[in-house]
Amino acid sequence: MNRAVKIRIYPNKEQRVQIEQTIGCSRFIYNQMLADKISYYQKEKKMLRNTPAGYKKEYPWLKEVDSLALANAQLHLESAFRKFFREPACGFPRYKSKKHARNSYTTNALNGNILLQDTHLKLPKMSVIRIKLHRQIPSDWKLKSVTVSREPSGKYFASLLFCCENQTVEKRPAERFLGIDFAMQGMCVFSTGERAGYPMFYRKAEKKLAREQRKLSHCEKESRNYQKQKKRVALCHEKIKNQRKDFQHKLSRELAERYDAVCVENLNLKGMSGGLHLGKGVQDNGYGQFLFMLGY
């Protein structure tokens, strides 16, 4: 089975430039391969089998970044096409934008090219990066890949994917059951009559967020003050997101320990958020994310 651990990393100025360069090259190769596939199919009515290696002669600066990051960009594109062919409702693969809120790249652990220590992380074609590791990684976990990302707030993170042995859990008859139903106020209601008591973090921060966004609208676009204020707005959103995730992690963990089986109603949350003026409330609840956490 696979386990993921997300950690905060603190790259210096040179390392930040290298990370941004790798993210940019991964985005470029994804978009270029997608454009060439579309163009080739329009002419030949066949799928083009292109690889990142075929672009390095024309674009030699691609050699400056981690080749595994480019290979993963190719895998992500192929995965997007498979999803589209399997389920057209997912939509045709789209170009990646430089202005996307969250930018990232993925590299794989091969032949000791990635080194993880208590306070440092060594990535391919990069010097050692300072990190903050909040938990001890078991010695029998094998590192598979690392995804480096930059959040809108400017913070950098590394998501470490490990391969570990399946944990055998003794099966026993379910005795303690709980039913959960969606609720606009408090996120959900339990069959015991209790409510989850979700504090509605977005609603509480709405006035402050509106004030910061109003300041942003008055700044000259792309100026230094604009970038500073944009970061403040991103930090507000990040705090709300972290508060929501912390609450849901703790609640899902508590329910998983107290009950043997939990039954939930199958709802079209996307449809609910799109109609009846419920969008803001449904998205603030994060009910879908809570069910996902409860599942694992």
For each predicted feature, which ranges?
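Short, Φ-rich (hydrophobic/aromatic) sequence segments
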Residues: 26-37, 73-76, 80-81, 85, ...
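Generic detection of short hydrophobic beta-strand segments and adjacent strand-loop junctions
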Residues: 7-9, 129-135, 196-198
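Short amphipathic alpha-helical segments with coiled-coil-like heptad repeat character
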Residues: 18-23, 85-88, 257, 263
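Gly/serine-rich nucleotide phosphate-binding loop at the start of the catalytic core
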Residues: 1-70
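Hydrophobic (often cysteine-bearing) scaffold residues that line and stabilize catalytic clefts
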Residues: 15, 26, 66-73, 244-251, ...
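Positively charged, helix-rich recognition surfaces that bind polyanionic ligands
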Residues: 3-6, 139-142, 152-296
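Long, hydrophobic, amphipathic alpha-helical segments used as structural scaffolds
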Residues: 34, 38-41, 81, 85-92, ...
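Acidic carboxylate diad motif detector
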Residues: 50-152
